[in-house]
Structure formats: structure tokens, C-alpha cells
């Protein structure tokens, strides 16, 4: 294969993985969709928006997971969505973004430097989640790593470096996001508690309760009638294995709370609409390790969460679902499988065996896919910059506009 030889000569680290991995791939949880494209929803404006972000998810990752799960002619749930686009991901100071700058772009509508969250080097900017809350919409963040990690932080915090996770935890509570599910309990515990990552004695879990949050460590404790819920299911990143809740289960629970029409006394509530961000956080982790089987599993877990969003949107008729990524990780490619023995010309070999190659263990500058379904989906076709996403969402939801600097703030 000439491209492999050329890549090796250029000094690229090429790692080839076969679909016949040494570890069995457990995807028994995956429920594949039908093959028909979802029908368009005629409403022009959504009442609700669910944004799914697959961390590190490029087209190579999506295609590889599809082939392993449902075959080359099948479709994932996200691939059933009728509107597609391509998203450019560069940051202000690099052709290759990180999750902090990418989240800031998708939340605040600005390009910023890598590692910076919710601001540029000079000043902070409001996120679409903050603007939605000001407009009266309900808001939520659901992730499988720490809730203080770069992607969720980009939607509700403003710090000079993504590693300031103890500060981010304080800002998340101050932002009063209605529903927050994920890991990261260590950043909310006072320093004298085993496992705490804090250097002070602030008990943010107690502060959350005093602020009106119901704190849970198990989804069985979540009721739709709750107004504000903080669920931390691991000290740092979740394992994404039972007994922890799956991303799909957390997504369903978050939607249930955000869309609830009754309080816990059975009294009716107005349904102002909601904006929810759901991240498949650990696709990226697997790609950094070039671990193909883990990547496939994480992407399919993410796709099951997308399924939950699609099923709600199909019944609701007023919900826009977007699926995209912050960046691609690993430079994953699908390449020709080795030629059969005795074959003179490998180009003539017809094989459906999956063979993949990683080009690195870091982020890349590849554009990433975007899939859209629901009212307003047609605004997300074509080639978009990642800063275009919040700008168009602001128009659809009647909030914003972005970018919008924070005039007075106590953030650091």
C-alpha cells in the first residue's frame, strides 16, 4: 500500500488495527435503528434543543463503529438524521483545537486559545446555556467524565485554564444549571475528605443543597418533579460500566426533569423549553490510547444516548437534536485489508474485513461531522465553523446574540 510507505517515510506513526482484536467487543447493549432516514419535522422553530458532542469523534470513528455494529450498509442512530453538515474546528491559536477552545466556540461563539474556557485572553463571554437561562429556558449538562471537564465547563464557566477544575466546580453551581449529571465528585468535596481534589474546606455538595439542588449518586433518586438536580456518579471520570448509569440513562433522566410539567406536589408547571448538552466524553480517551475496541464501545454508548434524544424529539415535535464533535482524535482511517495469500494484485482483492490505521495519539485538525433532526435542522447543513453553531441556535431560540461579553463578572 503506497500511502502507508509514504507515511512511514514522512515520519508518521502509523498503527494498524484489525477488527479481529484480542479482546471481545461487548456491544450487546446496542440497539440498532431501522434503515430509513428520519422524516423532517415541519415546525420552523424548536422549543427545546439537545446538543450531543462526541469528544474526539471524526468520520473515521463513526464509520468504524457503524461497520462493527451494523455492517457497512447499516446506519447508526445519528446517521438516520436527515440533515448533515461538516464543522471546522481550528482554535484562535492553533489549526488543531483542544476541547476547551472547541467548547468555548460551540457555547460562546468565539475563537479562543487552546486551554481557555468561556473567554478569550482578555475577557469572558456568555454561553448559550447562560443566555438560555436568562431567557427563562431550563438547562442541563450530561457527561461521562468529570462535570468540571473542558467540554461541560465551556457552557457554564469562564477560566483562564481548563485545569482550574476546583474553580470550575464553584462556577457551575453559581451558573445554576438545572441538571448536571456526570463524574467529578472529588472537586466538590472539602480537602479533609478522602479523595478530594480541593485545597480549601468548601463543601460544594452542601452549598448545592442550600442553593436548591437535589443531590443524587444514583439515578433511582431522580424524580421528574425536581427543579434542580446534581448527580455525581464517580469521584472523577465515570467507568461507563454498571452499576453506574449509562449515558443514555442519564440523558433520559435529564430530559425527564427538564421537560417536566408538574412539581413534586402535583401542581402544573409551565414548560418554557430547555437546552441540554450531552457529551460522549470518553470516545476521546480511547482515541488517545489508539484503543479501537474501547473507542467503538464508547461511540455506541454515545449513539444510544442520541437514540434517546431522537425518540423524545420524534414524539415531542418541538425539539431540535444536533450531533457533532469538538475535534477528531487519533487520525483514524479505514484502510485496505491485507491481500489474500497467492493474490498477484492486491488491488483486485475484494474483502469486507475491517482494517483501520491510526496516524497519531493526539487531536487532529480534521473537520468533524454534524447531524441534525427537528425544527430548524436545515440551518445546520453545509460547511460550518464551530462558532456558527451557537449563533444559529440563538436565532432559533430567541436568545443572545453571541458573542456577548460578560460586562460584570466575578470569574477568574
Question: What is each of the regions a protein language model found here?
Answer:
Residues 45-66, 121-135:
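Active-site-adjacent structural elements in enzyme catalytic domains
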Residues 114-170, 176:
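Extracytoplasmic mature domains of secreted/periplasmic and thylakoid-lumen proteins
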Residues 52, 142, 322-324:
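Structural motif
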Residues 22-26, 43-48, 57-63, 67-104, ...:
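A post-motif C-terminal structural segment
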Residues 15-22:
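Signal peptide processing junction and immediate N-terminal pro/mature segment
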Residues 3-15:
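Bacterial N-terminal signal peptides
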Residues 27-41:
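A short, compositionally biased domain-edge/stem linker segment
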Residues 98-120:
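A glycine- and small-residue-enriched flexible loop/hinge segment at structural boundaries
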Amino acid at each position: 500500500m503506497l500511502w502507508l510507505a509514504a507515511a512511514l517515510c514522512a515520519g508518521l506513526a502509523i498503527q494498524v488495527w484489525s477488527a479481529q482484536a484480542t479482546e471481545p467487543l461487548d456491544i450487546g447493549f446496542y440497539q440498532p435503528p431501522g434503515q430509513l432516514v428520519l422524516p423532517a419535522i415541519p415546525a420552523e422553530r424548536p422549543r427545546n434543543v439537545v446538543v450531543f458532542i462526541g469528544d474526539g469523534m471524526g468520520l473515521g470513528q463513526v464509520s468504524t463503529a457503524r461497520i462493527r455494529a451494523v455492517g457497512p450498509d447499516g446506519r447508526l442512530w445519528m446517521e438516520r438524521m436527515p440533515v448533515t453538515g461538516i464543522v471546522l474546528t481550528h482554535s484562535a491559536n492553533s489549526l488543531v483545537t483542544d476541547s476547551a477552545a472547541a467548547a468555548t466556540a460551540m457555547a460562546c461563539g468565539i475563537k479562543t486559545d487552546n486551554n481557555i474556557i468561556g473567554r478569550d485572553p482578555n475577557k469572558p463571554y456568555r454561553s448559550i446555556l447562560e443566555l438560555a437561562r436568562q431567557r427563562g429556558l431550563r438547562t442541563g449538562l450530561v457527561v461521562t467524565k468529570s462535570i468540571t471537564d473542558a467540554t461541560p465547563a465551556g457552557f457554564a464557566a469562564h477560566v483562564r485554564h481548563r485545569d482550574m477544575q476546583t474553580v470550575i466546580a464553584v462556577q457551575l453551581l453559581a451558573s445554576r444549571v438545572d441538571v448536571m449529571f456526570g463524574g467529578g465528585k472529588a472537586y466538590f468535596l472539602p480537602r479533609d475528605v478522602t479523595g478530594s481534589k480541593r485545597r480549601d474546606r468548601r463543601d460544594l455538595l452542601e452549598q448545592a443543597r442550600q442553593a436548591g439542588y437535589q443531590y443524587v449518586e444514583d439515578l433511582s433518586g431522580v424524580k421528574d418533579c425536581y427543579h434542580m438536580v446534581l448527580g455525581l456518579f464517580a469521584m472523577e471520570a465515570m467507568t461507563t460500566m454498571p452499576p453506574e448509569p449509562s449515558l443514555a440513562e442519564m440523558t433520559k433522566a435529564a430530559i425527564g426533569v427538564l421537560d417536566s410539567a408538574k412539581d413534586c406536589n402535583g401542581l402544573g408547571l409551565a414548560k418554557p423549553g430547555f437546552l441540554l448538552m450531552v457529551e460522549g466524553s470518553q470516545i476521546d480517551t480511547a482515541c488517545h490510547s489508539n484503543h479501537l475496541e474501547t473507542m467503538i464501545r464508547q461511540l455506541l454508548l454515545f449513539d444510544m444516548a442520541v437514540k434517546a434524544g431522537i425518540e423524545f424529539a420524534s414524539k415531542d415535535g418541538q425539539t431540535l437534536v444536533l450531533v457533532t464533535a469538538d475535534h477528531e482524535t487519533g487520525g483514524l482511517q479505514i484502510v485496505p485489508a491485507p491481500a489474500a495469500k497467492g493474490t498477484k494484485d492486491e488491488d483486485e482483492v475484494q474483502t469486507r474485513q475491517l482494517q483501520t490505521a491510526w496516524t497519531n495519539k493526539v487531536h487532529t485538525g480534521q473537520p468533524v461531522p454534524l447531524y441534525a433532526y427537528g425544527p430548524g435542522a436545515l440551518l445546520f447543513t453545509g460547511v460550518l465553523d464551530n462558532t456558527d453553531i451557537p449563533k444559529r441556535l440563538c436565532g432559533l431560540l430567541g436568545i443572545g446574540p453571541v458573542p456577548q461579553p460578560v460586562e460584570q463578572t466575578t470569574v477568574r
